[in-house]
Curated annotation (Swiss-Prot):
It is found in: Cytoplasm. HAMAP family: AIRS. Pfam families: AIRS, AIRS_C. It comes from the Archaea. CDD domains: PurM. The keyword Nucleotide-binding applies. NCBIfam families: purM (TIGR00878). Its EC number is 6.3.3.1. It catalyses: 2-formamido-N(1)-(5-O-phospho-beta-D-ribosyl)acetamidine + ATP = 5-amino-1-(5-phospho-beta-D-ribosyl)imidazole + ADP + phosphate + H(+). Pathway: Purine metabolism; IMP biosynthesis via de novo pathway; 5-amino-1-(5-phospho-D-ribosyl)imidazole from N(2)-formyl-N(1)-(5-phospho-D-ribosyl)glycinamide: step 2/2. This is Phosphoribosylformylglycinamidine cyclo-ligase.
Length: 319
């Protein structure tokens, strides 16, 4: 059965093939295996980490709604949140903005968003590239590269049965699944007038909340493309999750024609970051994170394999 995401033009299996090609081409190019949230090289007694990511097709909705600034925040968030997942503290970044034609208003608002995101993440934007490329770009494309530093990388190897899994509330859809969302809008199944403002909410920046307690955390997973299937990166043990009731925008997307289980393979469903912690540190970590974040106790790690998700409809999904 063809997934709704593939019908929208995003073939996750093909992306896996491309990841494998990159892995085979650039093997042994970093400390971690290519395909993790980020990678790093050894630099004296520390690790220099680097990550690149973009906003994707959310920019198309940005132009349609006129809500541009959040995409600048998205660009920062997608990078710093992934860097912190390998135990790195983000330091600085550069941006790449490609335009179909001169767009003064877009450039100004993107830069404001980038500045706001950088301030929230406590990083500096130290350079970038702006290009006008008619015939190559339609609208605009936005991406960033961010570097970070770490004394000890987090690979997930410390995760063990009995560990507790926490979830941090998302700010909405964030920056993934927009090709499918646009398809639903184009087909008249989802109203941009009703949901445009909600769909343009920026990706939440978690790094500044997490960094002060990074040494107490065993592993982290930023819920982006591939959604909860990416938890397989963290551990080979069985992951058990009971998901909370998601924000209404996800129910609207599901009601527009996306199968219930597929929602958890594409969207964050209200949880933007997952954190693995020791049971004895759980309460202290929840207390600290709750100062800035909405924290859910989602589940636990046990012996076995795979991912078991109890959805908000109390249906069981195995990944």
């Amino acid at each position: 059965m063809v997934s709704e995401y593939k019908k929208a033009g995003v073939d996750l299996n093909k992306l896996k093939e491309y990841h494998t090609l990159a892995l085979n081409t650039f093997q042994n190019s970093g400390v971690l295996k290519i395909g993790h949230y980020a990678n790093a090289i050894k630099l004296d007694d520390k690790y220099l980490a680097m990550h690149v990511d973009g906003v994707g097709t959310k920019t198309i909705l940005a132009l349609k709604t006129g809500i541009i600034e959040p995409t600048g925040i998205d660009c920062i968030a997608m990078n710093v949140n992934d860097l912190v997942c390998i135990g790195a503290r983000p330091l600085a970044g550069v941006d790449y903005l490609a335009l179909e034609k001169p767009m003064d208003d877009v450039v100004e608002k993107v830069m404001k968003g980038l500045k706001q995101g950088a301030d929230e993440a406590n990083i500096e934007i130290i350079g970038g590239e702006t290009a006008i490329m008619p015939g190559v770009i339609t609208g605009y494309d936005l991406s960033c590269s961010v570097i970070g530093i770490s004394d000890r990388l987090k690979t997930g190897e410390d995760v063990a049965p009995g560990d507790v899994i926490l979830g941090l509330k998302s700010n909405g859809v964030h920056s993934n699944g927009y090709s499918l969302i646009r398809k639903l809008i184009d087909e008249g199944k989802l109203s941009l007038n009703d949901w445009g403002e909600e769909l343009m909410r920026p990706t939440r920046i978690y790094s500044s909340s997490i960094i002060p307690i990074l040494d107490k955390i065993k592993a982290l997973a930023h819920i982006t493309g591939g959604a909860f299937s990416k938890l397989k990166r963290i551990t080979n043990y069985r992951i058990n999750l009971k998901m909370p009731d998601p924000p209404e925008v996800f129910k609207a997307i599901e009601n527009a024609g996306v199968p219930h289980f597929e929602m958890y393979k594409i969207f964050n469903m209200g949880i933007g970051m997952i954190i693995f912690v020791s049971k004895d540190l759980k309460d202290d970590i929840i207390e600290f994170l709750s100062k800035k974040e909405t924290v859910y106790e989602l589940g636990y790690v046990e012996k076995g394999e795979g991912i078991k998700i109890t959805t908000y409809k109390n249906e069981i999904l195995y990944i």
